[in-house]
Amino acid sequence: MQIDNLEIRQAVWRDLPEILNIYEIARCFMAANGNAGQWGTEHPKEEILREDMAQGRLYAVTKHEKICGVFALISGADPTYTRIDGGNWHKEEPYLTIHRIAGNGTARGIFAACLEFAKQGSSYLRIDTHEKNRVMRHLLEKNGFRYCGIIYFRDGSPRMAYDYSVESTDLSG
């Protein structure tokens, strides 16, 4: 699928070295911008990416046939979204979750392209991010995501949870 000057396709095994490089670039960017804790030095682990690829839920964003971004789009209930503190999800219906979105800095509009792609699969989306990830929080708010509350990973670490509904953004925009 092509969105603006970016194309989105399922990631394939030969993409893995470049995808790993993109995540390394993203971790360095996050650390340099005060968010070293969200992904640390190893997240996402290669095993997670291999599982995402095997399940057909890892996507490569390309510009002129070169990978510039990556994200996972996951269908079904996310167990970490069962408990939410300080708020509520705006809807209780099937959703897609955007996880592990990252770019290598060579293209603009990766998040917007990911959002347009995800909207083709569902009118209701969820995502979470670390409170120190100011860049992602800005992108979420700029693109019509609404803050819902705090969710917790298995290890107890909190994340800010957001959702997006095509209907609510169409009415307000």
Regions found by a protein language model. Name each.
Residues 6-21:
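A short beta-loop-alpha structural element at the N-terminal edge
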Residues 27-47:
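Conserved GNAT-fold acetyl-CoA-binding loop/helix
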Residues 47-60, 77-79:
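A short helix-loop-beta-strand connector motif used in the catalytic cores of GNAT acetyltransferases and
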Residues 60, 66-76:
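Conserved beta-strand in the GNAT
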Residues 72-106:
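Conserved acyl-donor/pantetheine-binding loop and adjacent beta-alpha core of acyl/acetyltransferases
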Residues 103-120, 138-142:
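Conserved acetyl-CoA-binding loop-helix of GNAT-fold acetyltransferases
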Residues 112, 132-149, 157:
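Conserved active-site alpha-helix within GNAT-family acetyltransferase domains
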Residues 120-131:
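Conserved GNAT acetyl-CoA-binding A-motif
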